[in-house]
Amino acid sequence: MPTREELAEVAALAGMQRALALYRLGLRTEASTEWLWTVRKMNDRALLAAAELARVNGIWDRVINTADRTVAEHDFTLRYPEPYGNVLSKQARARKLDEPLVFGLVRQESRFISDAKSSAGASGLMQLLPSTARRIAMIIGMKDFNKSRLGRPEVNAALGAYYLRHVLDGFGGNPVLAAAAYNAGPGRARSWCDAKPLEGAIYVETIPFAETRQYVKKVMANTVYYAAVMGGDQRSLKSRLGTIEGAMAMKADANK
C-alpha cells in the first residue's frame, strides 16, 4: 500500500492533474492518453500510488492497468479490484454463479467501466449487445427495458448474469467453454471441440480466433486471482481448465 507521502507526490504531478481533470470532464480518450504518458517511466512504488489515486477517483481501468505495470512489487487488490461488488455478487448468487468467474469476466470485458461501449455495439459492465439484452429482459420480465439502461450496473449485471448462466448450462457448467461462448458465440465454442475429450488447456490453445483465445486465457486467469483475493475456491488454473468433453458428448448434452 502506498504511503500518504507517495500518494501526495504522484497527485501533485502536472500530468496527473491534467489527466484527472480530463476524466472529470468526461474526455476519457484524452485523459487515458495523458495518464499513460505520465506513468510511463514510474517505478513500482509510484505506479502503486497512481493506481491507488485512480481507485480513489473511481477510474477502474486505470487502477487495473497501472497496477498491472509493476515489475517486482505488486498489490493484487489493485490489480483485481471489486467495484460494484454488491451488485455483481448479488446477481452471481441469484444465478448460482462462481463470484470470481463473474468478476474475472467483467474485468476482461469492460475493466469495470459501467458505460463502456465496444466497436461491435456491446455495452456496460458485461458488454451485452442490445439485441441479446432485449431478449433476456423479456425472458426475466424486466419491464421498460431500453438499450440506454445497459449503462446502469444493476441492469447490466442482472442481464449479464442470466446470459452467463445460460451459456454455462449449455456447456455442462464448463467455464472454459462458457467463456469461449460468451466471446465468440455458443456455436463456435462447440465447433472447436475435438471428437474426443481433451485437456482444457489444449482446447484453449487450439481456438482459431486469437482474440477469443486470449480472452479465455485472461478470464480463467482472472478467476484464479479473484478467488485468491476474495478468499474463495483456491483451485489451480490447471484444475479450473479441466477437461473438455468430446464433440459427440457435447452434442448429446446440447440436445437434452
Regions found by a protein language model. Give the residues of each.
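Catalytic glycan-binding domains that act on GlcNAc-containing polysaccharides
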Residues: 1-9, 15-18, 25-256
